[in-house]
Amino acid sequence: MSDYRLHDNSTVVIIGGGPGGAACAIKLLQGARASGLNLRVVIFEGKDFSVHANQCVGVLSPPVEDVLSGELGIQLPPSIIKRQIFGYRLHGAHENVLLTGHGATASDIRHGRATYAVERAEFDQFMLDRARALGAEVTESRVTGIEFVRDGSLDEVRVYSESEYERADVVVGAFGLDEAMLSVFEDVTRRDGGYERPSKWLKSYLTTIETTPSFQTEKLGHIVHAFLMPPGCPRIEFGAITPKGDHTLVNIAGERVSSCDLDLFLRMPEVQALLPGFDPARINYYEGRFPSAPARGAYGHRYALVGDATGWLRPFKGKGINTAIITGARAAEVMLAHGVSKRALANYRKSCSDLRGDYRYGVMVRRLMMMGARFFLDPMIDVGKTDPLMYDALFDSVSGHDSYRNIIKRSLKPHLVRKVAARVFSGLRRYKALRAKRMPDISIRKMTVRDIDKVLRIDEKITGKPHAAYYESKADAYISRGPEYCLVAEHLDRVVGFVLGDVRGWEYAAELSGWMEIIGVDPEYHGRGVSRALMTELFARFKRAGVTVVNTMVNWNDGDLIDYFRANGFERGEYVNLVKNLAEET
């Protein structure tokens, strides 16, 4: 049985010149050139990208940069990048957390890849121009009909448009969720197994608000603000505020949302605090949609669908640009390697098993969020502030950096379930109160140089290692510079704990603040309120010095230690430490 291989002078027609269609054309022409094949690629695109708006947020997230460079040999030009995105702030009803991807998987290279906000029309034009430069013919016309001709020895595709007529060996549908083209494909493929459009989708509405660079730097920086199931907006599943340099994009999505829900979202105090003043009557709304269920029959004899038309997107964070580029490139690879028959194109479906396989996990996450977000989201955010595994799960869910399957696999840990349950059923106050027991006869006083040996012995009991030279120099320096902030705790004239603090400012552009450098408690006195007594006294002294913020540093992977500081009022700060491994340099 023939697989109908592409040959010299074969014609491939691609309907749609967006990222999926352009990626398919680029991969086809690159592959044909590498194998010495003379291939004709025709792209039909009815939009003028300089005029028509694309109802898409326009965020390029990993691994799209790797796909562009590795698969298509394309480097993103700086001119189309409006802003690099360094993180997301997830908002619940009462809690919020800054998510930068540096949690339990901080060493994973995937979490170091860049995310960019781009102008979709400019990105689409850039991709189409690259396809044209490789030899793709671009016809600026809308396709009106398709005909699959199988009559004796004649087996071809005929494509009709408002201006041109083409005969092709295969047709690629890269038209998104265009109603007219969806209907055309469903009608003409019905006898051959049949394409059926995605059965479910989410509606989206977006608007752009002009902002000055200074306002955006002050209010948003390089952070996308994400709102899951925002209170007061029951139909909104997801809302976001995305900085784009010269303007800010606001969008919402949900199965039953309308433009009135965007009105409600823009009136939320938390949203208005992130936007400049604007006249609601003078801003434009744009309507769009993206699939939340897979299509059926996304390939067949001499045809393949790519991008949104496949429905092979994440149910929550769709990553539509990524899916379009990846499916477009993979469809091209399969056509070149295997052919354009239905049997040959079955390899296209197999090559996208990673996209399709994640669907049921995404549905599970979406249903859980729909049922319990308003009840569980705040406790999950609260746990995520101190637990790296939960932090990563929230980051990956919002950013789309990892599959839902991996998110669920990493997150279903007994200790996470217990922590969330503790927040839900006991409440944060009781959670903190359980740690607040204190012995009544603990006294706090200033540390002296005579206490250094006692501090050293406590540290050795904690760590099992001697640090005599370190503590002698460290403690002496702190006592000399700020004796008010170096304290010891005594019980019956025995030193049972210590803390070294300092007041300094303008490091990393931070205001004057208190620093809690080291705190230690004799293991025999753990759980008796010694550390809380030390911190209470230290913080009181900081306040008398005019300090309003206290800093400390811990290993992000030490969940128990982070839990401890969280119980004592510490939150994850705005700064993230960056490291460079000089040993890896050649």
Positions of predicted regions on the chain:
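N-terminal FAD cofactor-binding segment of flavoenzymes
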Residues: 48-94
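FAD/FMN-dependent oxidoreductases across multiple families
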Residues: 81, 235, 256-335, 340-342, ...
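Predominantly flavin-linked oxidoreductase catalytic cores and closely associated redox partners
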Residues: 27, 130-275
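Glycine-rich FAD pyrophosphate-binding loop
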Residues: 29-54
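Acetyl-CoA-dependent GNAT
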Residues: 449-450, 457-511, 517
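Conserved acetyl-CoA-binding loop-helix of GNAT-fold acetyltransferases
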Residues: 521, 527-540, 567
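Conserved GNAT acetyl-CoA-binding A-motif
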Residues: 542-554
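C-terminal helical "tail/cap" subdomain of flavin- and related membrane-associated enzymes
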Residues: 336-437
